[in-house]
């Protein structure tokens, strides 16, 4: 499994190139193509928040933000992904609460259904307007293309019930996990858990003291 971690300074546009890169020695197994890339806002203090919330669904991102309602990832994979996220967040000191309780952070996840789709934070409102105030993210942002089918995108942002400056929300952490769908249920489940765990391993700045 390949790993990459970057901090936000100027907007980062290179994750797509990383994910599209060829395996240096030639892939023998599907798992050889796995990539986990993470980025974060280096100015954000992740030790301050104590609570988070997340939706209970994971949309399939098709490249058409007008699709309503969006298709959803199948329940079994959704449950595995969200439970793994909860376990990782709990292990580093964050407590999950209902969104109505006013969490410090909100985490959303999406899975790509198509290849060669361009992903921008600004389109996230399309998928989460029912759950989270619909404001586009502002730089630092990630704009990438050529993710592969089955890539899992995980975003973290501060939660607010008030209108943010310039009507824009600052994203503070993103994980991009390629290779969560191969057609083999048992293999996919292992790769999902390993990929999410690796995203947290390579993000040591996350967590409370």
Residue ranges and their predicted role:
Residues 18-21:
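C-terminal motif of bacterial Sec signal peptides marking the signal peptidase cleavage site
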Residues 23-43, 145-155, 160-172, 177-209:
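C-terminal/domain-edge helix-coil "capping" segments
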Residues 109-164:
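Surface-exposed short loop/turn segments
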Residues 49, 89, 102-106, 147-151, ...:
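Extracytoplasmic
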Residues 1-12:
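Bacterial N-terminal signal peptides that target proteins for export
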Residues 44-46, 69-81, 99, 142-148, ...:
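Extracytoplasmic/periplasmic, Sec-exported soluble proteins
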């Amino acid at each position: 499994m390949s790993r990459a971690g970057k901090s936000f300074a100027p907007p980062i546009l290179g994750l797509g190139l990383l994910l599209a890169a060829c395996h240096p020695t030639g892939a023998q197994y599907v798992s050889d193509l796995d990539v986990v890339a993470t980025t974060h806002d280096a100015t954000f203090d992740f030790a301050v928040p104590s609570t988070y919330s997340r939706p209970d669904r994971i949309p399939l991102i098709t490249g058409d933000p007008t699709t309503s309602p969006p298709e959803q990832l199948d329940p079994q994979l959704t449950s595995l992904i969200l439970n793994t996220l909860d376990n990782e967040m709990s292990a580093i000191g964050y407590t999950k609460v209902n969104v109505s309780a006013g969490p410090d952070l909100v985490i959303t996840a999406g899975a790509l259904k198509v290849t060669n789709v361009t992903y921008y934070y600004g389109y996230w409102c399309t998928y989460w307007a029912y759950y989270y105030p619909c404001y586009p993210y502002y730089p630092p942002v990630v704009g990438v293309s050529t993710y592969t089918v089955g890539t899992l995108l995980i975003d973290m942002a501060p939660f607010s019930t008030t209108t943010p400056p310039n009507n824009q929300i600052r994203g503070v952490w993103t994980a991009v996990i390629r290779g969560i769908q191969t057609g083999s249920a048992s293999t996919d489940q292992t790769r999902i858990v390993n990929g999410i765990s690796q995203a947290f391993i390579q993000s040591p700045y996350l967590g409370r003291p």
